[in-house]
Amino acid sequence: MEDKRIVLAIILSLVVFLGWHSFAEYMGWISPKVQHVANERHSSVDQTATSNIALDSVQSVFSPPTGKDVYIETPLYIAKIHSSGGILSSFILKKYKVNLDNTSPLVNLVSPEASQAMPLGITLNGQPSWSNGNWSFLGGDLYLKPGETKELTFVGIVNGVKIIRIFTFNADSYLIHEKLQLASEKQNSCPTKVGLLVAATPFGTGQYDPTRMAWSIKDSFKEETSIDTLKEKGIQESGEFNWGGVMSNYFMNVVALSDPLYLTIKGRIQNDVWRVALERSNVLIPAEGTTSITVNWWFGPKDRELLSRAPDKLENAIDFGMFSIIAKPLLTALTFFYEYTGNWGVAIIVLTLCIKIVFWPLSQKSYNSMEQMKKLQPMMQKLREKYANDRDTLNREIMQLYKTYKVNPAGGCLPILLQIPVFIGLYQALLNSIELRHATFIYYLPFTHLVWLADLSAADPFYITPLLMGASMFLQQKLTPASGDPTQQKIMMVMPIIFTVMFLNFPAGLVIYWLFNNLLSIGQQWWMLRKA
């Protein structure tokens, strides 16, 4: 019985880990996050609204500056930058669609609404540079072929400070490198506070892919996902930052400064636009001299390979949580299997099989231990009846029973306990992998023209795999040696129902993993029963 209690505690803990957020939203304890992809939004933003970019000193109007648009096209994206201040007007990803429809538009990480918050913009002492000065640019539209890098320079005069923004674009990366030069025409040195802005409308797609504000401070990942908090209070924190911005599981708009510097991050949601600023205070511009700041911007997917080559710890933006040490090798293995199978769903099944093989000896030990515990149940029941009013003696007698028959009461649950971090690691790996976005397993439901498992990052639209998963759990429960406690038996039989309901809206890739893991476990249990 003690063995079953431990197993039950582990399972309930896993249920809480996976299902708490959904339950809390359903009960109304936290507000639901209504997310949309940027291209699907049709809300309007008041162009004369006062900026609440979280740069408290900025109280200027975010109105479109005069000037012209400059286009930059690479094999990866098409960007549009406004010549007045170097403001980003749109950033369209050429390799990613909003949805699976053939007519779907491409993902635009800077929607028309977000562009009103002036992403890629800079402020000096809280004043917007794009509307308080005269700007010109050197060059024209840029078209980059693979392997090429090209530059674009914007020059402005704002309140006696000459701003030179030299952007370098790489055809093979989403990174935009900027050399920001500030030159003073004054006779004395000028301490200046410089703000760097990013903005986005929500490009997350729901509960398992929320849009959030995130930042890296002293190489540690931090984030804020609460819409209520970001609307009412916003965020503000100072420290040695690597980068900060807006992101979902798959995409991000962030700004970074080379080398960790003491900065302040501020962010807020206003009119459904997520605005983040990194502020660097006391930037000293020497008298009649120039100071330079190295800035890196990333507007694009959270691609592990590309981010691993990016500066400023940008690879930390892919956060796998406390089980990253497990999630990363699992994702590497999954990618390896995909290269040979050409199908992410098949790759998940192969990975599941490999994990099952690794844990086969432990699972076998678990089943043996539970079978031994089952044989002891009649003797344990007699002890409970004999010492019903003497719990201390009962516990001593039960422990002596374990010792006599050489049974470890935890032997059945420890192997399960060891597998839970693997499941959570894989959960995080699948949830944060851009490779699985719109990855197909079985496009059409067999014998129909209904789109089925066309996107492993989305839920099964017909709930077929969650129902099969629940049925497999029920069958597995039937094959597992039962506890002598009727109450525990009833609870364990209810678990498949709980998991089925919980998995209805899980990404299909995770459900497939759990389903095939159950099927392999059933096969192992059947083999052991035949062997016995």
From Swiss-Prot:
It is a multi-pass membrane protein. GO terms for cellular component: plasma membrane. The chain crosses the membrane at residues 6-26, 317-337, 342-362, 411-431, 451-473, 496-516. Its main location: membrane. Pfam families: 60KD_IMP, YidC_periplas. CDD domains: 5TM_YidC_Alb3, EcYidC-like_peri. It is found in: Cell membrane. GO terms for biological process: protein insertion into membrane; protein transport. The keyword Membrane applies. GO terms for molecular function: membrane insertase activity. Keywords: Cell membrane, Chaperone, Membrane, Protein transport, Transmembrane, Transmembrane helix, Transport. The keyword Cell membrane applies. Interacts with the Sec translocase complex via SecD. Specifically interacts with transmembrane segments of nascent integral membrane proteins during membrane integration. Required for the insertion and/or proper folding and/or complex formation of integral membrane proteins into the membrane. Involved in integration of membrane proteins that insert both dependently and independently of the Sec translocase complex, as well as at least some lipoproteins. Aids folding of multispanning membrane proteins. NCBIfam families: yidC_nterm, yidC_oxa1_cterm. HAMAP family: YidC_type1. Belongs to the OXA1/ALB3/YidC family. Type 1 subfamily. This is Membrane protein insertase YidC. It comes from Lawsonia intracellularis (strain PHE/MN1-00). The gene is yidC.
